[in-house]
Amino acid sequence: MLADRIAERAAALAERRGNTVAVIVVDLREISADISSALVSQLVTPRLQQAISALGEADGIIASTPVYKAGPSGLFTSFFDVLDNDLLIAKPVVLAATAGTARHALVADDQMRPLFAYLRTMTVPTSVFAAPEDWADPALNTRIDRAATELVLLMESGFARQVRDESWQSYQHELGSAGGTELAIDLDTDLMRLATGGAAG
């Protein structure tokens, strides 16, 4: 519900600014078994791959979770645990959380923000939190508007694309990752030919 409200504001703002927006919802409850399986087997099912691809192709992300045991849901963190570390580099992200009490208001900034910093995303400055008493509070709408505006402006700037185009090779990538740095290795050298059993030129 909170993510939907942020997405609606972001889409409306983007359209007012002359952009066409398609909102794709990834409901982790529908792929919970796929996420659990991937954690223990490293095998990604087609349904999970579809969700991962949706994030990889998105211009921006709204990452929203309920709070359980004073932290993001285990399903939420497990999903991001199975992602390629390079998938979301420089991707604009809004962090959002809901809980049954305002005592968990800092979960988005204290616990979610470090996770997305590790994934090297571009999280917007404003996170959004809602407890039951917040839904009718105009202050929540103000934060939603602010976060949506920050997201749209980052998406419009093409920041993520520019980072990939201009400085992708300066990031540390793992073999076989979305970074694909192994493809930059020159295989047509004497050393590589010798390593593969061929003769040096």
Each language-model region and where it sits:
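Hydrophobic alpha-helical membrane-association signature
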Residues: 2-6, 108, 147
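Glycine-rich phosphate/pyrophosphate-binding loop and the adjoining helix
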Residues: 129-201
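N-terminal beta1-alpha1-beta2 submodule of the flavodoxin-like/Rossmannoid cofactor-binding fold
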Residues: 1-77, 181-201
